[in-house]
Each structure stands twice: as structure tokens, then as C-alpha cells.
From Swiss-Prot:
Subunit structure comment from the entry: Homotetramer.
Disulfide-bonded cysteines: none
Entry cofactors: Zn(2+)
Domain of life: Bacteria
Residues binding Zn(2+) 1: C38, H63, E64
Stated role: Catalyzes the NAD(+)-dependent oxidation of L-threonine to 2-amino-3-ketobutyrate.
Gene3D superfamilies for this protein: Medium-chain alcohol dehydrogenases, catalytic domain, NAD(P)-binding Rossmann-like Domain
GO biological process terms held by the UniProt record: L-threonine catabolic process to glycine
Record's catalysed reaction(s): L-threonine + NAD(+) = (2S)-2-amino-3-oxobutanoate + NADH + H(+)
Name of the coding gene: tdh
Protein's UniProt name: L-threonine 3-dehydrogenase
Subcellular location: Cytoplasm
Main location: cytoplasm
Length: 341
């Protein structure tokens, strides 16, 4: 089968012919139809320090996908050939304390699809049946392909109650934009998103945020005054990993506010902990998706009218993957989809 493979310890990916994956008695074989390019994939493509330390070559990469089931193992009773499915990108051990307690997203022995085991940038992928999510009938395949990052957005945005609250989102990348849309759909009063990239701020505006703020041009304090806010934001969603963005968030939260933090800083990050203590802020780290509560929430939100399709801005055939990675690296894109059919 054709696959995009990290076959050399240098920048780039290579389209190669590799064996079709075999399945065990508890596995599902999926014919991949669409994939999304993730920031993780860009790191692997560029072969940065994290990728060099993490990826063992050769490795077929990619973890955002939708496909059609082709075959199932003999123990698989709940999935059938023809089902349209995606897969949870974290394969857990099933035996640790967190897994036994139903907190599988906290498994310390997680294996990442397309990172620690063969990925979805291929014509076929095999996964354990416990990692398979069947989509509702009629779902747009491009949207289904980005359930992984959409799940990051939902997990972050719904970590704290947002009904009637004022929500600040720092970082207007695709996940930040989707998180803002989720908070709005969940009845937040105001959703304000910040960034420095005009393209992405414009994209955020298309998905209905209350304000898309270029912090080079406008201060959050002034935005609060325009909206009639007097005590700061109630909920913060830190999606950027940018120290300045996080410090700006801390300075604009109400006393007792809650912050969900998905953005990963490049290194150690200094903040004024006195603000956290005296303002009694709660900061919660977010990683991945809750298995599978987040997936239920994603499906229900789409079925109840949430439209995230505008966040998908570019589409290519997998043979044109270089164009997809180029536009992703430019910063002037939302989600980028590769077609495999």
C-alpha cells in the first residue's frame, strides 16, 4: 500500500510502498479516506529536536483520519465492514491504575498513533477495536477526519462550565478557533480570541467569535470595556503555548477564574505566581481527549448544529502532500485535509 513515511533521519517525508498491516483478533482494518495534517506531523516533517528524540525511523506517520472498515478480527462484534469510523490516537495499556479506573486518557503508557506506532497517512491502518469511533450517518468526511484536534478543542473548552460565562482564548490556531466555537455553542456569553496572525483572526471571526483581537493593535482591557465587562474573564483557554499570551491571560482573568491549558510552551515559562495565588485562579492541564466522553460530546455538538467546517481551508490529494505541509508551515491556513480515495 502507499504511505507517507519518515524513512530518513532528516527533514521531509517520502511516499513509499509498504506492506498492508495485519490485524489480530481484537483489531480493525480501516481503508483510509481522509487525513488531517497536524502540527505534530509538521514537527516530524521538519525533523526538529522533539521529532529527533521521539520518532524511530522508518515510521508511517499521521493520526487524524476517517475511513471505512474493511475487515475485523474474530473477537470484534460491534464493528462491521462498511462502517465509517475514526480512531482515538492514543493507544493505552488497559492495565494501569488510571485505565482500570476508567481514566484512560491519563494512561502513563500511552502509545501515539503515527508517533510510537504506524500511523494513518496510508491507504490502510489497523487499530484495536477499543480505539474505534463509529460516526453518525451522513457526517461530512472532511469534518470526521479532524475529530482528533476537534476533540482537543472540546476537551479544553468544556473542562469548566461556560454557560453564561465570558471566555478568553489565547491562540487562534485551528484548535483554538474550534475551542472558541465550542464555547459559543455551549452558551458562553462572550468569546474573545487573541493572536498576532491576521489570517487566523479573520478565520476565527468567520466561526462567530465575539471579538478576534490582534494584541499588537488592541489591549484586552480595552476590549473588556467595549463589551461592558468589569471584572475580567471567567474562563481562559490557553491554546498558544506562548509565554506572553499566557501572562496576558493571567492579567485579564477575574478573581476565582479557571484556566484550561492545552498549548505547550517550548521550554520553561516564567509567570507571576502571586497573581495565581492572590486571585485564586485554577489552572488545569489538558492533553488529548477523554475516552470516550469527549467523543460523545463532539458528535452531539455537531448533530445539534455546531458547524466547524469553515476551519478547514485547504484540501489536497495525498500525492500532493508537499503542498499541504507547505501551507501548514506558512501559518496562513486552518486545517489541511489530504484525500486518500
Amino acid at each position: 500500500m502507499k504511505a507517507l513515511v519518515k524513512s530518513k533521519s532528516q527533514p521531509g517525508l517520502w511516499l513509499e510502498e509498504i506492506p498492508e498491516p495485519a490485524i489480530g483478533i481484537n483489531d480493525v482494518l480501516i481503508r483510509v479516506l481522509r487525513t488531517g495534517i497536524c502540527g505534530t506531523d509538521v514537527h516530524i516533517y521538519k525533523w526538529d529536536e522533539w521529532a529527533r528524540e521521539t520518532i524511530h525511523v522508518p515510521m508511517a506517520i499521521g493520526h487524524e483520519f476517517v475511513g471505512r472498515i474493511e475487515a475485523v478480527g474474530s473477537n470484534v462484534a460491534d464493528f462491521f465492514p462498511g462502517d465509517i469510523v475514526s480512531g482515538e490516537g492514543h493507544v493505552v495499556c488497559g492495565r494501569c491504575r488510571n485505565c482500570f479506573a476508567g481514566r484512560r486518557h491519563l494512561c502513563a503508557k500511552t502509545m501515539g498513533v503515527g508517533v510510537n506506532r504506524p500511523g494513518a497517512f496510508a491507504e490502510y491502518i489497523a487499530l484495536p477495536m477499543t480505539n474505534i469511533w463509529r460516526h453518525h450517518e451522513g457526517i461530512d468526511l472532511d469534518v470526521a477526519a479532524i475529530f482528533d484536534p476537534f476533540g482537543n478543542a472540546v476537551h479544553t473548552a468544556l473542562s469548566f462550565p461556560v454557560l453564561g460565562e465570558d471566555v478568553l482564548i489565547t491562540g487562534a490556531g485551528p484548535i483554538g478557533i474550534m475551542a472558541a466555537a465550542v464555547a459559543r455553542h455551549a452558551a458562553a456569553r462572550y468569546t474573545v480570541i487573541t493572536d498576532l496572525n491576521p489570517y487566523r483572526l479573520e478565520l476565527a471571526a468567520k466561526l462567530g467569535v465575539t471579538r478576534a483581537v490582534n494584541v499588537r493593535e488592541q489591549k484586552l482591557g480595552d476590549v473588556q470595556k467595549e463589551l461592558g465587562m468589569t471584572e475580567g474573564f471567567d474562563v481562559g483557554l490557553e491554546m498558544s503555548g506562548n509565554p506572553a499570551g499566557f501572562r496576558d491571560m493571567l492579567a485579564n482573568m477575574s478573581h476565582g477564574a479557571k484556566i484550561a491549558m492545552l498549548g505547550i510552551p517550548a521550554g520553561e515559562m516564567a509567570i507571576d505566581w502571586r497573581t495565581v495565588i492572590f486571585n485564586m485562579l485554577t489552572i488545569k492541564g489538558i492533553y488529548g481527549r477523554e475516552m470516550y466522553e469527549t467523543w460523545y460530546k463532539m458528535s452531539v455538538m455537531l448533530q445539534s448544529g455546531l458547524d466547524i467546517s469553515p476551519v478547514i481551508t485547504h484540501r489536497y490529494h495525498y500525492t500532493d502532500f508537499e503542498k499541504g505541509f507547505e501551507v501548514m508551515s506558512s501559518g496562513n491556513s486552518g486545517k489541511v485535509i489530504l484525500s486518500w480515495d
